[in-house]
Amino acid sequence: MQISELFAVRGYGVVVTGGASGLGLAYAEALAENGARVTILDLNAAQVAEQSARLTAAGHDVRGATVNVTDHAALDAAIDAAAGLYGRLDVVFANAGVDSGAGFVDGWVGEERKRVPEGALENYTDERWNRVIDVNLNGVFATLRAAARHMRPRRSGRIIVTTSLAANKVEPAIGSAYMAAKAGAFHLTQCVALELAAYGITVNAIAPGFIVTNIGGGHAKKPETQATVGKFIPMHRVGFPDDLKGLALFLASPGSAYITGQQITIDGGWGLGFAD
């Protein structure tokens, strides 16, 4: 295979959950800008319409649909529709997620931190816990299940799950439900990768570190937060969604054909320890 073909995704049928903003939008852009046909699924109808229209106007083959990944029947129908439209389903990004509110401390590394009662274990409500698990773990399960239904008969496909550095590293500013769900999503990635490997389907995870998105109420978008946290990251800066585009394209492409069951971290070295 020529090197130019290793990262070729032109004509691929792609679905991205949570694709109208943040990391999901970066994934959608990465694939669409390289000739893939992309369906954005997201809960936010206004953002779905805005981003799909923007990318279409730029000359890319992008459509959108409003879907809540906790509604598994609606999710199945949306993925079925995309596969029917494209005549194939080559790549699915299981990306949709929500944050879980405050952890047991308020503030990121480098910021003034104090324990907060709303993040304490004994104050965690069933509703809060279940909401995060329903989206960040059960939603991933439902997305992988729907993808497998289309990919297994074709004996081909790429599934990419968004996990988190928090799947392996405890961060007290993050709610425990989020970390538990992301850890579960990574283990699910490995389980499904093992099951589907014999069918030529790869299943991998992208684990972002501190990336500037709207999650967490947009706290990461504050310049002062970026400057403070960035000092403790070995690369001396926080990450942005565009930092994930290259990996997203690689994992979706023929170049990653012999990689499965892996979680690849993009965190500027944060998981290695603090920089001076």
PLM feature segments, named:
Residues 98, 111-141, 156, 160, ...:
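Catalytic Tyr-X3-Lys loop
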Residues 113-126, 160-184, 189-190, 194-198, ...:
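Catalytic loop of short-chain dehydrogenase/reductase
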Residues 3-39:
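Canonical Rossmann dinucleotide-binding motif of NAD(H)/NADP(H)-dependent dehydrogenases/reductases
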Residues 197, 202, 259-261:
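Short, small/polar-rich loop/turn modules that mediate ligand/substrate recognition or access, typified
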Residues 149, 194-195, 257:
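Alpha-helical segment proximal to the catalytic Tyr-Lys
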Residues 1-6, 249, 260-276:
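Short C-terminal tail/terminal secondary-structure segment
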Residues 233-244:
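A conserved structural motif in NAD(P)-dependent oxidoreductases
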Residues 45-46, 65-79, 126, 243:
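The beta1-alpha1 cofactor-binding region of Rossmann-like NAD(H)/NADP(H)-dependent oxidoreductases
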